[in-house]
């Protein structure tokens, strides 16, 4: 069984990291798929985001980090992954993620989506919120892993 955890991760937050660590305990392995989203201009380019994630996950040897573009369901098909992992912070996340899960299922009936609720310590976090705090010099060390914190401070100085 291969599990795919897709996202833009611009940047990776401690909420993402917590979800990855918990999923690794449950499933034993995981593929973190970093989306190259051509409709958005990311703060960090794809290569930098992958480096940040790999450096943040160095303590988890069973985690693979890849990049992809296009549909997540196509990425899952290419990897022969039959499970897509998504995190839920609030009810609004559930409504959005359920719609995506149903769309993926309509494109490939063998794909299942598994939802893990976010640890309450991180339920307020989003990548855009972290960038906003970093932009104005706020403390972010409790929001992101050290490799990401370093890059954000450098980016916004």
From Swiss-Prot:
Binding positions for substrate per the UniProt entry: 8, 40, 72, 86
Biological pathway: Cofactor biosynthesis; coenzyme A biosynthesis; CoA from (R)-pantothenate: step 4/5
EC nos: 2.7.7.3
CC cofactor: Mg(2+)
GO BP: any one term: coenzyme A biosynthetic process
Primary localization class, coarse: cytoplasm
Record localization: Cytoplasm
CDD domains, sorted: PPAT
GO MF entry, a single one: ATP binding
Domain of life of the organism encoding this protein: Bacteria
GO cellular component: cytoplasm
Marked site (Transition state stabilizer) residue numbers: 16
Keywords (A to Z) from UniProt: ATP-binding, Coenzyme A biosynthesis, Cytoplasm, Magnesium, Nucleotide-binding, Nucleotidyltransferase, Transferase
Coiled coil segments of this chain: none
InterPro entries to which the protein is assigned, alphabetical: Cyt_trans-like (IPR004821), PPAT (IPR001980), Rossmann-like_a/b/a_fold (IPR014729)
Gene3D superfamilies: HUPs
Pfam families per the UniProt record, alphabetical: CTP_transf_like
Function: Reversibly transfers an adenylyl group from ATP to 4'-phosphopantetheine, yielding dephospho-CoA (dPCoA) and pyrophosphate.
Subunit structure: Homohexamer.
Family of this protein: Belongs to the bacterial CoaD family.
Protein's name in the database: Phosphopantetheine adenylyltransferase
Natural source organism: Prochlorococcus marinus (strain AS9601)
């Amino acid at each position: 069984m291969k599990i795919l955890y897709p996202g833009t991760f611009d940047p990776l937050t401690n909420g993402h990291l917590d979800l990855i660590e918990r999923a690794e305990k449950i499933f034993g392995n995981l593929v973190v798929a970093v989306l190259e989203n051509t409709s958005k201009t990311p703060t960090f380019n794809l290569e930098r985001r992958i480096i940040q994630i790999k450096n943040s996950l160095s303590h988890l040897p069973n985690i693979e980090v890849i990049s992809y573009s296009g549909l997540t369901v196509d990425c899952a098909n290419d990897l022969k992954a039959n499970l897509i992992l998504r995190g839920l912070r609030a009810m609004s996340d559930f409504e959005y993620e359920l719609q995506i899960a149903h769309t993926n299922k309509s494109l490939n009936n063998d794909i299942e989506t598994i939802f893990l609720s976010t640890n309450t310590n991180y339920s307020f976090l989003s990548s855009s919120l972290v960038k906003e705090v970093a932009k104005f010099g706020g403390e972010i060390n409790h929001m992101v892993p050290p490799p990401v914190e370093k890059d954000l401070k450098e980016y916004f100085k």
